[in-house]
Structure formats: C-alpha cells, structure tokens
Amino acid sequence: MATWFQGPADDFIRVSREGFERGVRILHFLGGSSVDVAGKRALSQTKMTITQRADVEGVECDVVCTGRFVDFLERRDRWGIVLRQPIYESDRIIPVDPASPPQLDRGLLESFPEGYRHLAYLQTRNGFTVKPDMPGLKGPEVEALYASGRKWLLGENLDR
C-alpha cells in the first residue's frame, strides 16, 4: 500500500512505470531494520525516507517523508513479502529555490494526516487520489497494524 496506490504488486509496478514515463520522480531510501521471526513467518520494520519532486502551486518542491515499512513475511519455497504497510511519521515540503516558497491552501493541507500531509498535498495537487487513513505515529490505524503483526507471528491470517 502507498498513499496514492492500493492494489496488487503487479499493478503497482505498472502504474509506477507509467508515472516515470510521464516524469513522476519518487525516490525511496531505506535505513536500519529489525526482524521478528516465528517459524515460517516474520515481521520486519525498516526505516525509510520517501522523496518526491514536483510542482506545488507553481513552485518546484521536494517533499521528504520519513517513516517505516512494516513487512509481513512468510517462508514458502523462499522468504517473501506478503504485505508491506508504511507508517508515515513526519514530512516536510522544501522549495527547490528557498527564495520562492509555495503558497499552500491551509485548509487542504490540514485535511490530511499529520505524518504525510505535505506528501498528500503534493500528490493531490498533481492528480493522485490519496488514501486518507494510513498509519502514523499514533492512532487507531497504527494500533491495528501492530495488532495485525502480533497475530501474524502467532499464525493467524491477515485481515485485508
């Protein structure tokens, strides 16, 4: 899952390629990981940073979003990711030219969750439909994700 896409991996790859062909640039940087293993199942958390450059209100900007990828893994013939769910912790918008900050629509900006509001703003203004209830640092969405992780390691099925 992502702020702008929910669906199968093959479709994500296809629409990502299509976006790249149109000039969409989204970079992901990965940091440290922790992994809990229980038999043929595992749950990992990996620090991540997402950077997207695009026009925001007529100004070229970078949005930098920091969080974690929570991966539900299973060993079948080999280890593989069954589900990847981001947790969005914080973000910011940075004009490429600091002398030209964008004039943001405060109402629109504040309509998005705190952990990814600038990313959601940029993506919305550039034609994407953004999922409004992704997990952040706190709240029912992240608590439900943690509960799913505990159940996953106990052998229960994912609620999707």
Stretches with model-predicted labels:
Residues 30-32, 66-70, 83:
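Extracellular structured ligand-interaction cores
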Residues 76, 80-160:
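Terminal "cap-and-tail" regions of soluble proteins that handle hydrophobic small molecules
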Residues 9, 21, 33, 69, ...:
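Compositionally biased, intrinsically disordered low-complexity regions
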Residues 1-52:
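A solvent-exposed, acidic/Ser-Thr-rich amphipathic alpha-helical stretch
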